[in-house]
Amino acid sequence: MAKKVVALIKLQVKAGQANPAPPVGPALGQRGLNIMEFCKAFNAATSKLEPGLPTPVIITAYSDRTFTFITKSTPASVLLKKAAGVSSGSKRPNTDKVGKVTRKQLEEIVKVKEADLTAAELEAAVRTIAGSARSMGLTVEG
């Protein structure tokens, strides 16, 4: 018989830096899950990623106090800010431009995010990420 799902917990945790402090501890603790077990498993799963990049994770909690988790790729906005070398996007993206990204940088971001994107082709995925860049106040070159 399949385990009964008690909760789906969505968090953003820095890659390789999960610890019992908020937001991980309280989110897992109130469901009765083993916090240290999650931290060790998450840090092992994200050891290949660049340390410190926010990584979305979806934790499925079961009635017998066990869990499984799925890590997603880093949000496009974080990757775009890193590529453009800016700390935050523009407050008025249509009038104030805060940085530039090239098509090559967009293609690299698409390669990182390809598992989470629904686009069928590389060109469509690049256009999706370019739209995100423009909505943050970044100029897309190329």
From Swiss-Prot:
Database matches in SUPFAM superfamilies: Ribosomal L11/L12e N-terminal domain (SSF54747), Ribosomal protein L11, C-terminal domain (SSF46906)
Swiss-Prot/TrEMBL keywords: Methylation, Ribonucleoprotein, Ribosomal protein, RNA-binding, rRNA-binding
Gene Ontology, cellular component aspect: cytosolic large ribosomal subunit
Keyword Ribosomal protein: yes
A GO molecular function held by the record: structural constituent of ribosome
Domain of life: Bacteria
Post-translational modification: One or more lysine residues are methylated.
GO biological process: translation
UniProt KW RNA-binding keyword: yes
Description of how the protein assembles with itself and partners: Part of the ribosomal stalk of the 50S ribosomal subunit. Interacts with L10 and the large rRNA to form the base of the stalk. L10 forms an elongated spine to which L12 dimers bind in a sequential fashion forming a multimeric L10(L12)X complex.
Classification via HAMAP family: Ribosomal_uL11
Family note: Belongs to the universal ribosomal protein uL11 family.
Function field: Forms part of the ribosomal stalk which helps the ribosome interact with GTP-bound translation factors.
Name of the protein this chain belongs to: Large ribosomal subunit protein uL11
Biological source species: Xanthomonas campestris pv. campestris (strain ATCC 33913 / DSM 3586 / NCPPB 528 / LMG 568 / P 25)
